[in-house]
Swiss-Prot record:
This is D-erythrulose kinase. ATP binds at D397, G398, D399, H400, G401, R402, G403, T443, S444, G485, R542, D555, A556, G557. The active site is at H217 (tele-hemiaminal-histidine intermediate). It catalyses: D-erythrulose + ATP = D-erythrulose 4-phosphate + ADP + H(+). Pfam families: Dak1, Dak2. Residues 368-570 form the DhaL domain. Catalyzes the phosphorylation of D-erythrulose to D-erythrulose-4P. Involved in the degradation pathways of erythritol and D-threitol, that allow M.smegmatis to grow on these compounds as the sole carbon source. The keyword Amino-acid biosynthesis does not apply. It comes from Mycolicibacterium smegmatis (strain ATCC 700084 / mc(2)155). InterPro entries: DhaK_dom, DhaL_dom, DhaL_dom_sf, Dihydroxyacetone_Kinase. It comes from the Bacteria. Residues 329-360 are annotated as: Disordered. One of its GO terms (cellular component) is cytosol.
């Protein structure tokens, strides 16, 4: 259990305060994460890694010479926002471009690609790459669907060494692709991990068993097996990884036996003795192995085995020196191109027109209703946090409730601030959407941000939107989710509640029903649709590898969307009664 914290909701922020103070020789804080304490030298590609926290030393612990130039730090097991990723990349960038790289998770892929788009619009050359090493998360031939777990480390290390050597951005991306194609990982869990403040783990493993094929975000394994001896575990891991080996003739391999947070180093060394013997018996030469904690999952008990097949180039980068807070190899040279950073900051946005200048009285009246709706949503989601987390943990990482609370709380504050500045309903929704995406992180954060900003763009800041405009705004929101999320109705996502909600609202509005009444009826339809997702199997996201396990449990994203729709309906009813 994660026992030491102040406010569980601020665990990541509090962790960063201590980390930065303890490692000021290596890193400084910037909005969204950390960068090297020394500026990036001219001509060097900046490598920015990242993801949710809870994996230390991944990701902030490997920022320094020979490794990453920056790390984007999200909330526990939650993708950082696009704004945070872009902020860290700007701070790390010198003049040769930026590679942003993460494990292959929907939220990271969405947010970091959005960050790349933003950086390119500012004239910064940027690329994104996702690691896909987890052999348990998708079958051979479907490698693009695989998660990134401890193989993140080998890919990040080689790409960073290539950048340190002076390769251009295309060359660094090529090395990342080669390292990823050569890397395979299989993990096991003996017990689940517990989020700060929670009184139970995200999953449990029956006594005397282990979960095979775990994820690093608290996702349980894809199957359960009886707990073997150390020798038996070594054989399971070696057979699993080598059984999926790439079509490569190389017999020289980099190997990581990675602890997940609670498994003792002494235990890992016992297992390593067996792993190394099995690999050598099969004719492999092990190059500079790593045994220890490199990519963890809070206090999860378990370990994983990673193998990267080495050609001459990858071996050079794997063996290259590095000097970071948590990982050191050889003697890495400090490249200083100027004064030591005191702090790097993201570019400040230019100020636009004052919000009050864009609105009229009707728009400001609508803004007051929108702000009240965000108040109500934040309270409803706070009450539902534990249940949403429980639903999400059945086949996912259990962070949905916490992410929705952080997002809705940030949206509530942003809406209130915009309202105080005289904003109309469109600007209030826009501000709330941006805040939700920035603070919630993860897949749901970026999707809710897109939903709210699309709705706000349609409603505008002047006049009182009629029922047809509101229905069109909801359709715009749905279309934004389709464009950004890559999911479709039936995939067991929030779309399975959003589409019925949208269609019912449109149908009733087309029959001249008031939007208030239509919204209530549509919310009821969305609630039933969310419940019906219990019968679906997820086809996208972290729950996909555990699709069968999720049957019988509704989708957390659909459930929370329906809850928000009902809450808005209640808020509208109260407001209407107040006017009467």
């Amino acid at each position: 259990m994660t026992k030491l914290f102040n406010d569980p909701a601020r665990f990541t922020e509090d962790m960063l305060v201590g980390f930065l103070d303890a490692n000021s020789r290596y890193v400084v804080g910037v909005p969204g994460g950390v960068v090297r304490a020394q500026t990036t030298r001219p001509g060097k590609v900046a490598v920015v890694i990242g993801g949710g926290s809870g994996h230390y030393p991944a990701f902030c612990g490997t920022v320094g010479p020979g490794f990453a130039d920056g790390a984007v730090v999200g909330n526990i097991f939650t993708s950082p926002s696009a704004e945070e990723a872009a902020s860290v990349a700007r701070a790390a960038h010198s003049d040769a471009g930026v590679l942003l790289t993460t494990g292959n998770y929907a939220g990271d892929v969405m947010n970091f690609n959005l960050a790349v788009d933003q950086l390119r619009s500012e004239g910064i050359e940027a690329q994104y790459f996702a690691v896909t090493d987890d052999v348990a998360s998708a079958e051979r031939g479907q490698e693009a669907k695989r998660r990134g777990i401890a193989g993140d480390f080998t890919v990040f290390k080689c790409a960073s060494a290539a950048a340190e050597e002076g390769l251009d951005l295309a060359g660094v991306v090529r090395v990342a692709e080669a390292a990823n194609a050569a890397t395979r990982t299989l993990g096991v869990a003996f017990d689940g991990c517990t989020l700060p403040g929670a009184d139970h783990p995200l999953f449990t493993v029956p006594e005397g068993h282990m979960g095979l094929g775990l994820g690093i975000h608290g996702e349980p394994g894809v199957s359960e097996e009886k707990m073997p001896t150390a020798a038996g575990l070594a054989a399971t891991l070696v057979d699993g990884v080598l059984g999926d080996r790439p079509d490569a003739p190389e017999k020289r391999i980099a190997v990581i036996l990675n602890g997940l947070g609670r498994t003792k180093y002494e235990e890992l060394f016992v297992v390593w003795g067996e792993v190394s013997r099995l690999l050598r018996d099969r004719g492999y030469t092990i190059v500079e192995p790593e045994v220890g904690e490199l990519v963890t999952s809070l206090d999860m008990a378990g370990c994983s085995l990673t193998v990267m097949w080495l050609d001459e180039e990858l071996e050079r980068y794997w063996a290259a020196p590095a000097d970071t807070p948590a990982y050191k190899k050889g003697a890495a040279q400090q490249h200083v191109s100027g004064e030591r950073r005191s702090e790097a900051t993201a570019r400040s946005a230019s100020s636009g027109p004052k919000l009050a200048e864009l609105s009229d009285e009707d728009g400001r009246a609508g803004a007051r209703l929108v702000a009240r709706a965000f108040d109500a949503m934040a309270e409803a989601l706070a009450d539902a946090e534990e249940e949403l987390g429980r639903i999400d943990a059945v086949a996912g990482d259990g962070d949905h409730g916490r992410g929705m609370v952080k997002g809705s709380s940030a949206a509530r504050e942003a809406a209130a601030s915009a309202l105080s500045e005289g904003a109309g309903q469109g600007s209030v929704l826009n501000a709330a959407g941006k805040a939700w995406a920035a603070k919630a992180g993860g897949t749901s954060g970026v999707l809710w941000g897109a939903l709210l900003t699309a709705l706000g763009a349609r409603l505008g800041d002047t006049g009182r939107p009629d029922s047809s405009v509101i229905a069109a705004g909801v359709r715009d929101a749905y279309d934004a989710l389709i464009r950004l999320g890559g999911a479709a109705p039936g995939d067991k996502t929030m779309l399975d509640a959003m589409l019925p909600f949208t269609e019912e609202l449109e149908r009733r509005v087309a029959q001249d029903e008031s939007w208030q009444s239509a919204w209530r009826a549509a919310a009821d339809v969305a609630t039933e649709a969310a419940r019906a997702t219990a019968d679906l199997r997820p086809k996208i996201g972290r729950a996909r590898p555990l699709a069968e396990r999720s049957v019988g449990t509704p989708d957390a994203g659909a459930t929370s969307l329906a809850l928000c729709a009902r809450t808005v309906a209640d808020c509208v009813t109260l407001s209407t009664q107040g006017e009467n």
